[in-house]
UniProtKB/Swiss-Prot annotation:
Name of this chain's protein: HTH-type transcriptional regulator ArgP
DNA-binding listed as a keyword: yes
PANTHER family linked to this entry: HTH-TYPE TRANSCRIPTIONAL REGULATOR ARGP, TRANSCRIPTIONAL REGULATOR
Keyword check for DNA-binding: yes
Biological source species: Pectobacterium atrosepticum (strain SCRI 1043 / ATCC BAA-672) (Erwinia carotovora subsp. atroseptica)
Stretches of the chain forming a coiled coil according to its record: none
CDD domains, alphabetized: PBP2_IciA_ArgP
Gene designation per UniProt: argP
Length: 297
């Protein structure tokens, strides 16, 4: 059985996390040549490349599996040894989360864990359709995703759903939709997407108004909070989680443009199995709060 030296795995992990050999060497307090030698040793052991040497480097499929193994071992070491050997160094937990969860329910869910437990969070923001890929690649140990099926050697639980409403300010609605939300009016109304892969707005319009993707003007803004600001100031219409804008809807700063029509995104919590004690705390906190504030039907 091939048993890697975990120093070599840590070198591989550092190259991926630090996005290059030079910064990985600085992180590990060794020379860049030593980093290269450790990775070459690991590649020789498995008889195949573990890194695609692009800028930044990325792991091969086998490299992803080894990184996932490393992160599981690190968490299980914490499970068995606790913090006896590194009592002054909080445990690092890398999680992949979608921006809308981060802007609404996720931080309140983790409050008790952050207060009571010696951990450092590394929250990697990614679209909920792609967070599971970060777990697959071994970049994180847990992910909030819309995927209901677990990866091999992983666990999954349902968190609940975010319901997205199509909203705008009253002034925007009066300007662009004086006769209601129609197909022709939507073609002129500026919208906003999180990035070029965010298709929620386009999917909503296609499903309900038969508008083809790319047919409406659309800003790109990488911030969930900015969606609310853009809508409130009357510059765009957009899809925003109801949970995020309850106050704005109640005081009429924003209006639901299509009452009864919405997009529902069911969210699931994925993590490696078996869970460490600390990850179990994170799981319990996320599930408990998620089941309280997210739609369960």
């Amino acid at each position: 059985m091939k048993r890697p030296d975990y120093r070599t795995l840590q070198a591989l992990d550092a190259v991926i996390r630090e996005r290059g050999f030079e910064r990985a060497a600085q992180k590990l307090c060794i020379t860049q040549s030593a980093v290269s030698q450790r990775i070459k040793q690991l590649e020789n052991l498995f008889g195949q490349p573990l890194l695609v040497r692009t800028i930044p480097p990325r792991p091969t499929e086998q490299g992803q599996k080894l990184l996932a193994l490393l992160h599981q071992v690190e968490l299980l070491e914490e499970e068995w040894l606790g913090n006896e050997t590194n009592s002054d160094i909080p445990l690092l937990l890398s999680l992949a989360v979608n921006a809308d969860s981060l802007a609404t329910w996720l931080l309140p869910a983790l409050q008790s864990v952050l207060v009571d437990s010696p951990i450092r969070l590394n929250l990697q923001v990614e679209d909920e359709t792609r967070t599971q890929e970060r777990l697959r690649r071994g970049e994180v140990v847990g992910a909030v995703s819309i995927q209901s099926q677990p990866l091999p050697s992983c666990l999954v639980d349902k968190l609940g759903a975010l319901d997205y409403l199509f909203v705008a300010s009253p002034t925007f609605a009066a300007r662009y939709f004086p006769n209601g939300v129609t197909r022709s009016a939507l073609l002129r109304a500026p919208a906003v997407a999180f990035d070029h892969l965010d298709d929620m707005h386009q999917a909503f319009l296609q499903q309900n108004f038969d508008l083809s993707p790319g047919s409406v003007p659309c800003h790109i803004v990488n911030s969930s909070e900015a969606f609310v600001q853009l809508a409130r100031q009357g510059t765009t219409c957009c899809m925003i989680p109801h949970l995020q804008i309850e106050r704005e809807l109640a005081n009429n700063e924003l209006v639901d443009l299509t009452p009864g029509l919405f997009q529902r995104r069911m969210l699931y919590w994925h993590r490696f199995a078996p869970e460490s004690r600390m990850m179990r705390k994170v799981t319990d906190a996320l599930l408990s709060h998620g089941h309280q504030v997210l739609r369960q039907s």
